[in-house]
């Protein structure tokens, strides 16, 4: 809303390209918006819906025709230009809404959950189309979504927000691999990251994460921040993603200092993989294994955590403790 100019900026400066736009009217910011409801004019054809904003600008007729047909070609709408919105499918209507934005050739596209009204299959197809469109236009897209799959698959950079406060700005891979805090860690990834209460204990110069059910030796490279910030002897939260818990004998046999036992409470076969719902002592854990593993309720499994993929979070602030200086989430 602040980028579009619909709400005043309380602090800081907003640039679009090299232009400071804090005090520029919304209509003069050269922004196009696409919403989840397509907001098409029902009495106008696809062509006229796409041309509407250009006609308001008093653009020459031949230039309007050229822009509409170029956008229609990009979006595969050429054969639909004479139809009314009621004769179109949901995906086609959304493409028309995109086309209406494209013909304006804006500096920024603002997209507010544009796919949320579509069914799952169509949403997947449109996700690909919008990504291709972004690559071909080379224009900045700012895309609001609650769907982490859309964020991970489409974004060059993700801004994760909670209650209006930025939690992390990073590439999808870094958001996934190095979350700043427990909110980001739990929000991105399905099934979500496991969070386990542990106490950090030092033995023979090594640091272990321990509780009633497990004792995991931490990777030496992760211990500097724990020691220098006084976490030894304190309770923290251990985070581990389901795919970083291993059942394979070769991994378990080579990870004796990060093994633990757990009982199977439920197995959900997803085809290529199986989600194992486990209990280790009083701790509920989800692991993701190859779908060919046969799991039976009540089985006792010997498992190993990939200690290079373990995350440690402060129990009170929920901020990740890493080698860089421990800091509060930026506000």
Question: Which residues fall in each region the model found?
Answer:
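Helix-to-loop junction immediately C-terminal to a conserved catalytic motif
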Residues: 4
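Conserved coupling/switch loops of ABC nucleotide-binding domains, chiefly the family-specific signature
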Residues: 10-13, 63, 163, 310
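C-terminal boundary and immediately downstream tail of ABC-type ATPase nucleotide-binding domains
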Residues: 178-203, 306
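A position-specific signal in ABC ATPase nucleotide-binding domains
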Residues: 7-8, 15, 55
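Conserved ABC transporter NBD signature motif
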Residues: 12-20
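Glycine/charge-rich catalytic "coupling/switch" loops of P-loop NTPases
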Residues: 206-265, 293-331
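ABC ATPase nucleotide-binding domains
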Residues: 24-187
